[in-house]
Regions:
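Short linear loop/turn motifs
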Residues: 61, 69, 199-201, 266-273, ...
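Short, glycine-/small- and polar/acidic-enriched structural segments
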Residues: 24-160, 164-180, 207
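Bacterial N-terminal signal peptides that target proteins for export
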Residues: 1-9
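Secondary-structure end/capping motifs
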Residues: 222-306
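Bacterial N-terminal signal peptides
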Residues: 8-19
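Short, surface-exposed acidic
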Residues: 154-157, 193-197, 258-274, 309-316
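Pocket-lining segment of extracytoplasmic ligand-binding domains
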Residues: 88-89, 162-261
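Conserved C-terminal helix/tail region of periplasmic/extracytoplasmic solute-binding proteins
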Residues: 295-332
Length: 332
C-alpha cells in the first residue's frame, strides 16, 4: 500500500515539475491590437484563451488597444513587443524614424468604403461632386483623398466621428464606413442593401492592405524565432476562431464586457464573418496573406505623394521576413 502511495506521489511530483519547467521555458511577450476589443481581433483572443500562444512557447500578455492606448504610441515608446497596425501607419512610423518592421500581413484587401443612399442620386464617383462627405482623420483619410483626386471631385468634407447619425439623418450625403463595422450598423438601422450604393476603394484601384503584425527592429534582431512563433500562433488562432465561431464570439464578448464596451452579439458575428472574408478571401490557406512588393510600394508612393512621408523605406528594411521575388525593385 505504501509503495503504491509513493509511486503515485512520485508521478504527481514529476508531472508537476514538468509543468513548471514548461511554464518556465515560455518566453514573455506583449501584444496590443490597434483598436478596442471586438471581433476584428478575435483570432488573437482565441489563441490566447485556448493556449495556442503557450503551445508556441510564448507567455503572452494582450494589452487593451483603442483611442486611449494607441498601439503606434506604445510601439514607438518600446512599451510593447508586438502590435497590429495598418500598413499606412507602419510605413509612416518607419519613415519617421521609428524602426518598426513588418512580420506578416493579415488583411490584404481594404475594407474601407464610402456609402451613399440611392435616394441621393449618387450612383458613381462623379455624382459625389459638390456633395457633403463624412470622413475620418488620420490614416482613414488617405484613400478618400486619393479617390477624390483621381476623379477630380470637389466635395465638402465633414469630420465624422464614431457615429453614423449624420448619414442616417441626411446631414451628409456620403459616409465613410468599414465593411465589417459601420456598414453593418447602417443595415441594422433599417436600411436595406438595395437602398444603398457602396464604393469600396479596392474596386477603384486604391486597394491599401490594412492590418498587419509588427515589432521593433531590435525585437526581431534579438529573437526572430519568437517573432515567427508569434505569427504562427496568431494564424492558428484565427483559423480556430473561424472554425469555432460561437466559442470565439463568447471570448470576444467577454473581452468587450471587461473593457466596459457595449457588446452586440449579432454585430460581432457579422464582423467575425467579414474578417474571414478579408483574411482568407476564398478559402482558408496554410498561412496569412503575403504583402507583395507591388502593394507595398503602391501604398508607400501614395503616402509620399501626399507628403505623409519624405522617403520610402526599402522592402529589405521594412520587411525582414519578406519573401524575395525575381522582379523586386531596389531603393526608391
Amino acid at each position: 500500500m505504501l509503495n503504491k502511495f509513493v509511486i503515485k506521489l512520485t508521478i504527481c511530483i514529476w508531472f508537476g515539475a514538468t509543468g513548471l519547467l514548461a511554464q518556465s521555458n515560455l518566453k514573455k511577450a506583449s501584444f496590443i491590437p490597434h483598436w478596442s476589443p471586438q471581433a476584428q481581433f478575435a483570432g488573437y483572443y482565441y489563441a490566447y484563451e485556448t493556449g495556442i500562444y503557450k503551445k508556441h512557447g510564448i507567455d503572452l500578455t494582450i494589452l487593451t488597444g483603442g483611442p486611449n492606448h494607441p498601439a503606434s504610441v506604445l510601439m514607438q515608446k518600446g512599451e510593447v513587443d508586438f502590435a497590429s497596425l495598418w500598413l499606412t501607419n507602419a510605413i509612416q512610423l518607419h519613415a519617421g524614424g521609428v524602426p518598426v518592421v513588418h512580420l506578416t500581413q493579415v488583411i490584404n484587401r481594404s475594407a474601407l468604403m464610402l456609402v451613399a443612399k440611392k435616394s441621393s442620386g449618387i450612383e458613381k464617383p462623379e455624382d459625389m461632386n459638390g456633395k457633403k462627405v463624412g470622413i475620418w482623420g488620420g490614416d482613414f483619410e488617405i484613400q478618400p483623398t486619393a479617390f477624390f483626386e483621381k476623379y477630380n471631385l470637389k466635395v465638402r468634407l465633414i469630420p465624422q466621428g464614431g457615429s453614423i447619425n449624420l448619414f442616417l439623418s441626411d446631414a451628409i450625403d456620403v459616409t465613410s464606413a468599414m465593411w465589417y463595422n459601420e456598414y453593418h450598423t447602417i443595415l441594422n438601422s433599417g436600411l436595406n442593401p438595395d437602398e444603398l450604393n457602396t464604393f469600396f476603394f479596392s474596386d477603384y484601384d486604391l486597394n491599401f492592405p490594412e492590418e498587419g503584425l509588427y515589432c521593433l527592429e531590435k525585437t526581431y534582431a534579438r529573437d526572430p524565432r519568437l517573432c515567427r512563433e508569434f505569427v504562427q500562433a496568431s494564424y492558428e488562432g484565427w483559423v480556430g476562431a473561424f472554425e469555432h465561431p460561437d466559442e470565439a464570439l463568447e471570448i470576444v464578448l467577454t473581452y468587450m464586457k471587461n473593457a466596459k464596451l457595449p457588446a452586440n452579439r449579432p454585430h460581432q458575428r457579422w464582423m467575425l464573418s467579414r474578417m474571414k472574408d478579408l483574411i482568407f478571401l476564398q478559402e482558408i490557406t496554410g498561412n496569412f496573406p503575403e504583402l507583395t512588393e507591388k502593394d507595398y510600394y503602391f501604398v508607400a508612393e501614395k503616402l509620399r505623394d501626399n507628403e505623409s512621408i519624405k522617403f520610402i523605406p526599402t522592402c529589405e528594411k521594412f520587411c525582414p521576413e519578406w519573401k524575395k521575388s525575381t522582379d523586386r525593385k531596389t531603393d526608391k
